[in-house]
């Protein structure tokens, strides 16, 4: 029985004589339609087409192979019915040489068949990414050296580029800009023409009108989105004022101001918009009545103030300069942009020479060479098909393009030039909602242009057909996807209006499941609350952890990922425990879910996938993660790279500590602390040299390290890097060592890959260890991660963990999309020079002589456009993720404060059917979008109730189930599960009597209680604050609060990004200033103010931090007798870290005597101490507010902490601490101990 095609599918299969654009939604059977159309052409009784007369272009090699297989299967099926049909049998033979391929492979065929037209060596090969990156680095180094050596006007322009964009220390930033821009330009069909046209946009003539430029148009669009957000916020305030007694005057004033703001949305002209916004004034509000609600008055007044500030900011940022001044700014950018374009062209020439010498081409060359072969440029600059292109036009009866939404401009140019014009013969199929390869320069506007211009009418030369019936997913999945995207996807963000025409229509046929079975069900939303903000503030304030290092931040992130992974693992186990069933088309029946039916999708897999893999595996769930990343994060590679860095320069503390701690030298943690205490002012390397003079075991280890390092440094001078690297593997024994580690085979393979990279490096003109380390660092950034070896096959019965991008084109019965709270990556917006295929170059305006820089108005326009396109892509990525699900969709995400987030989502959904573009633009994660879209749904009432949000309920066919998780509870639950009684498990087994004695022995051993069990639970390390908490457990912390009161009034959503500093951050700023002040300079109010300004200039403080520092209180300290004594001392130390060893019984008083020799490392930071003739004076600063009459209680509370500081200080210095003080900034009190 043949396939039942819908009318739209039949139309796509049978229509002839037109260019056809098939807009095919997820799960609409587009591949089946494409294959059927090919079969239909081959078997057409009147005008049959041989398979080798068709060009079928797919996005990946895998897709090409699948297409070829499907065509073969279809042909064989027809041959079974018509075994005598020789022509059909011949098609199977022709299929092997049919052009069913990727665009790159097709272009490569064009180049190989016509190499003589390019003066190209026929034996050329394609260089891999590493090889071509090395050549690019080599070419850029040589080019820069040549430019520095020049003595003409080109050098002047180049030096201006270096001064403006080169960076503070060297020209590395400019090299990065050059390589990044070159990569972008090479993705365009005509790079040189694009550069020339772009540079000419800066060559403004006297008649240039900025107000009608494309840049002004984009900025106006962005401002209208901003204004709409401001307007919505004002309307919320207006709504709150309705029927408020005593605030009638406020109500009318707010209405009037909201109306003035609303009028801005009607202007499409720069000058009209400018005139209106400059005319907006916020007059003094009338007095409120005596019966006015003070809370409402305060809330709306605060909203109005924020709106005023925002309008003022827009005026100053965009409309403080006249259009003439803007024109002068653009004109001033012309010479430097021209110099940049010239540099790109010179680099292109040099890079081509390098490739020619090596006999290689890169992937971009393939497409450009093909375009060069297929086109001829006439005298007027028009592009015409060459003879080769005309040959292909004659050869191919029809050109098929799959995944058309992912085409880029050069690919479109190539396919257009070989396509026929009369009759048209292009068949393009794709879904613009699934265009997710912008980072590869895929351009969805190519699809849009045709989608908007092609007709739905049959018989037209250019026709479009819409396939929006989804044959993949259950109705619950489809309804939920439609509900989300009708709320958030628009023409501006997502670049598609998610209308009735675009939405998914249910087309799958799922049989009725067995009675009492668990199938399908509501879409699940799992929200995990991470550690609350208040807890974080308390910890930061008390522990003064203002210099939280990178490793700690990494640990926090890993913790958050672990929690999500554990929630996912728990849900997967529940699916199996409840015998969740899926429909299997192969057996035409329901069956219990398998692991292979489940996929976990992540936006980024580099840090996330390894954690998910480990957690699922520990939970007994077989899993597979083909991340393609993680190479540089593996222990063995990090260790060896650290070792190379140390051999090159041992003065680097972090790599040196990594090497010392590694199995290569095996220093213990205690020994490293001992080393640090040798001399707190010197580097670790200098401390090792000092320690090598000792006669103890540490001295021996230090001497061995220095001798070994010297030996390696001598060999590194004359040995090639690859040989030296292999020598290190063998001399350290590390290559053999990793083989004995878990996944040892893979680890050795990773080390061999590094060796291969070293061999490639040695083939260039670069030499030496220093340059190799730089190359590896550039490889991390420029080429991404290299990926580590695979061990488990993805075809096994495992849960797959993969990126959303890799899942495209696939489908799974159960889809779990995790990491939805992860913030969007916006780093592209902060480059010094932005670029856009339509808007050109957007540079920072730099006056290096005056040392000032700011974003040019051109950059502001491009920045907004890139942000818009980036978020549109993120929305399409989310769409791809959700549409992978066939039967069950589970969404998982974390948030710092769920109640706060729910209130934010409610504000975004409160005034309109669709979430506003402003709120979408200001969403920080997928969770923000999903939350705002679904928060009004009737099924989310429990979540609204939890957050105390009152919102009108919305009816919708979609079904939702919300589950809240707490990070702490998830971690505790995991620990509890890990401690399940093994003996109880043994008891549940049906053991033969034969094994009873053996069983008893097992039980005895498993029930053995270690006599020093408490020692197993003692921490190895505690902070001073933690010790204080343990020893002061009976003290109730209610007498101190922060000086810096946190704002409790609700802030409008559009201003949430400007929250101001938290209480902890303000205290941190005070400590930082006290640490960095130059005590030899003027410490008057003006002097302190000047030093703080200098700290901002040197980026020690941010401007926001500087504003929060109370210079009067700092001056007040230095006017005290204690402050004056400190200034008189010749030896003042500030922010001194320390470690001391305490007996566990000093901290845990209830431990018995046998624990006397169990030690705990205590660590902390001493704010300040200074030396006088008869000893040391210790000072600890506090920024707490102390309630009246509670000073003595505060003094008592911090007694333990001060004693520990004193003890540590005496251990470190060997000198007596004669006096100990706490200084309270709030009231200037000095507490002496």
UniProtKB/Swiss-Prot annotation:
Pfam families: PDDEXK_1, UvrD-helicase, UvrD_C
Complex formation: Heterodimer of AddA and AddB/RexB.
Residue positions binding ATP: 24-31
EC number of this enzyme: 3.1.-.-, 5.6.2.4
Function: The heterodimer acts as both an ATP-dependent DNA helicase and an ATP-dependent, dual-direction single-stranded exonuclease. Recognizes the chi site generating a DNA molecule suitable for the initiation of homologous recombination. The AddA nuclease domain is required for chi fragment generation; this subunit has the helicase and 3' -> 5' nuclease activities.
Family as reported in the entry's similarity comment: Belongs to the helicase family. AddA subfamily.
Gene name of the record: addA
Protein name: ATP-dependent helicase/nuclease subunit A
Lineage: Bacteria, Bacillati, Bacillota, Clostridia, Thermoanaerobacterales
Source organism per UniProt: Thermoanaerobacter pseudethanolicus (strain ATCC 33223 / 39E) (Clostridium thermohydrosulfuricum)
Protein keywords: ATP-binding, DNA damage, DNA repair, DNA-binding, Exonuclease, Helicase, Hydrolase, Isomerase, Nuclease, Nucleotide-binding
């Amino acid at each position: 029985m043949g396939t039942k095609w819908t009318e739209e599918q039949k139309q796509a299969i049978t229509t002839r004589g037109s260019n056809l654009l098939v807009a095919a939604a997820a799960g609409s059977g587009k591949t089946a339609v494409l294959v059927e159309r090919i079969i239909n052409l081959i078997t057409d009784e009147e005008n049959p087409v041989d398979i080798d007369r068709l060009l079928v272009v797919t996005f990946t090699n895998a897709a090409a192979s699948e297409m070829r297989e499907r065509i073969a299967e279809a042909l064989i099926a027809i041959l079974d019915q018509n075994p005598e049909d020789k022509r059909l049998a011949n098609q199977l033979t022709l299929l092997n040489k049919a052009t069913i391929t990727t665009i790159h492979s097709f272009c490569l065929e064009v180049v190989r068949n016509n190499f003589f037209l390019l003066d190209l060596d026929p034996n050329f090969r394609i260089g891999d990414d590493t090889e071509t990156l090395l050549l690019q680095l080599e070419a850029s180094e040589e080019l820069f050296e040549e430019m520095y050596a020049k003595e003409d006007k080109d050098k002047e322009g180049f030096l201006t580029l270096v001064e403006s964009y080169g960076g503070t220390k060297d020209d590395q930033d400019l090299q990065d800009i050059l390589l990044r821009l070159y990569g972008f330009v090479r993705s365009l069909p005509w790079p040189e023409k694009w550069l020339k046209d772009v540079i000419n946009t800066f060559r403004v003539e006297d008649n240039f009108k900025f107000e009608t430029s494309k840049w002004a148009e984009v900025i106006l669009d962005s401002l209208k989105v901003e204004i709409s957000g401001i307007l919505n916020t004002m309307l919320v305030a207006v709504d709150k004022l309705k029927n408020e007694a005593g605030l009638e005057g406020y109500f009318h004033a707010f209405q009037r101001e909201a109306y003035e703001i609303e009028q801005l949305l009607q202007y499409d002209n720069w000058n009209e918009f400018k005139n209106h916004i400059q005319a907006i004034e916020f007059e003094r509000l009338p007095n409120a009545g005596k019966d006015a609600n003070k809370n409402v008055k305060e809330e709306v007044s605060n909203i109005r103030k924020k709106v005023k500030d925002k309008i003022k900011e827009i005026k100053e940022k965009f409309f403080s300069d006249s259009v003439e001044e803007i024109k002068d700014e653009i004109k001033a950018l012309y010479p430097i942009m021209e110099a940049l374009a010239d540099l790109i062209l010179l680099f292109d020439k040099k890079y081509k020479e390098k490739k020619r010498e090596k006999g290689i081409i890169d992937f971009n060359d393939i497409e450009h060479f093909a375009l060069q072969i297929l086109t001829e440029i006439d005298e007027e600059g028009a592009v015409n098909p060459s003879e080769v292109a005309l040959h292909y036009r004659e050869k191919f009866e029809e050109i098929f393009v799959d995944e058309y939404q992912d085409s880029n401009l050069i690919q479109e140019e190539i396919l257009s030039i070989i396509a026929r014009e009369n009759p048209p013969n292009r068949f393009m199929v794709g879904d613009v909602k699934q265009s997710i390869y912008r980072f590869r320069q895929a351009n969805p506007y190519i699809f849009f242009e045709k989608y908007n211009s092609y007709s739905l009418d049959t018989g037209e030369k250019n026709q479009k057909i819409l396939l929006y019936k989804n044959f993949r997913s259950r109705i619950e999945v489809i309804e939920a996807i439609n509900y989300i995207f009708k709320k958030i996807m628009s023409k501006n963000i997502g670049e598609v209006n998610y209308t009735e025409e675009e939405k998914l229509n249910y087309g799958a046929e799922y049989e009725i499941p067995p009675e009492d079975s668990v199938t399908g069900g509501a879409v699940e939303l799992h929200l995990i609350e991470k550690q609350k903000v208040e807890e974080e503030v308390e910890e930061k304030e008390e522990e003064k952890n203002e210099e939280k290092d990178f490793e700690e931040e990494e640990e926090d992130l890993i913790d958050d990922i672990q929690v999500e992974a554990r929630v996912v693992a728990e849900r997967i186990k529940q699916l199996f425990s409840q015998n969740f069933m899926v429909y299997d088309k192969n057996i035409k029946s329901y069956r219990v879910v398998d692991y292979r039916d489940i996929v976990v999708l992540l936006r980024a897999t580099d840090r996330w996938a390894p954690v998910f893999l480990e957690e699922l595996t520990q939970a007994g769930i077989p899993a597979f993660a083909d991340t393609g990343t993680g190479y540089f994060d593996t222990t063995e590679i990090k260790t060896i790279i650290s070792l190379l860095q140390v051999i090159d320069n041992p003065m680097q503390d972090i790599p040196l500590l990594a090497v010392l701690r590694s199995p290569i030298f095996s220093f213990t943690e205690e020994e490293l602390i001992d080393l640090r205490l040798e001399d707190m002012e010197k580097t670790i390397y200098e401390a090792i040299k000092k320690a090598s003079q000792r006669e103890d075991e540490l001295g021996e280890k230090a001497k061995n390290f220095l001798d070994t390092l010297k030996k390696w440094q001598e060999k590194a001078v004359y040995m090639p890097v690859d040989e030296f690297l292999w020598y290190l593997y063998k001399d350290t024994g590390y290559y053999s060592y990793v083989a004995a580690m878990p996944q040892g085979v893979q680890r050795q393979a990773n080390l061999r890959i590094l060796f291969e990279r070293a061999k490639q490096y040695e083939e260039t003109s670069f030499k030496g260890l220093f340059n190799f380390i730089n190359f590896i660092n550039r490889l991390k950034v420029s080429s991404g991660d290299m990926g580590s070896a695979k061990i488990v096959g993805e075809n096994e019965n495992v849960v797959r963990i993969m990126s959303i991008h890799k899942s495209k084109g696939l489908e799974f019965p159960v889809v779990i999309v995790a990491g939805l709270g992860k913030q969007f990556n916006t780093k592209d917006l902060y480059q010094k020079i932005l670029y856009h295929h339509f808007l050109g170059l957007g540079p920072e305006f730099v006056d290096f002589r005056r040392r000032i820089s700011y974003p040019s108005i051109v950059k502001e326009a491009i920045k907004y456009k890139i942000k818009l396109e980036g978020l549109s892509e993120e929305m399409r990525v989310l769409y791809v993720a959700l549409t992978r699900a066939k039967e069950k969709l589970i969404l998982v995400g974390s948030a710092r404060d769920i109640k706060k987030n729910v209130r934010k989502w409610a504000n975004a959904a409160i005034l309109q059917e669709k979430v506003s573009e402003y709120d979408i633009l200001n969403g920080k994660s997928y969770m923000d979008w999903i939350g705002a879209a679904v928060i009004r749904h009737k099924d989310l009432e429990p979540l609204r109730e939890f957050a105390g949000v009152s919102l009108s309920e919305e009816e919708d066919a979609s079904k939702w189930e919300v589950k809240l998780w707490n990070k702490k509870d998830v971690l505790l639950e995991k620990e509890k599960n890990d401690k399940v009684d093994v003996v109880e498990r043994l008891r549940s087994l049906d053991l033969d009597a034969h094994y009873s004695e053996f069983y008893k022995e097992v039980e005895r051993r498993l029930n053995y209680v270690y006599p020093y069990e408490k020692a197993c639970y003692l921490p190895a390390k505690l902070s001073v604050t933690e010790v204080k908490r343990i020893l002061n457990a009976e003290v109730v912390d209610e007498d101190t609060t922060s000086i810096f009161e946190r704002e409790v009034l609700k802030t409008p959503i559009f201003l949430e990004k400007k929250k101001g500093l938290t209480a902890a951050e303000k205290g941190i700023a005070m400590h930082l200033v006290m640490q960095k002040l130059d005590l030899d300079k003027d410490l008057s109010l003006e002097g302190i103010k000047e030093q703080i300004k200098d700290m901002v200039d040197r980026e020690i403080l941010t401007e926001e931090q500087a504003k929060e520092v109370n210079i009067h209180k700092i001056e007040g300290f230095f006017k005290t007798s204690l402050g004056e004594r400190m200034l008189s001392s010749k030896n003042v130390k500030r922010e001194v870290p320390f470690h001391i060893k305490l007996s566990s019984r000093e901290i845990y008083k209830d431990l018995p005597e046998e624990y006397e020799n169990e030690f705990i490392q205590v660590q902390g930071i001493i704010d300040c101490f200074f030396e006088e003739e008869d000893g040391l004076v210790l000072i600890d600063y506090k920024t707490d507010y102390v309630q009246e009459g509670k000073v003595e209680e505060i003094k008592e509370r911090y007694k333990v902490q001060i004693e520990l500081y004193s003890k540590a200080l005496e251990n470190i210095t060997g000198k007596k601490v004669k006096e100990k003080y706490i200084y309270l900034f709030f009231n200037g009190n000095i507490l002496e101990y």
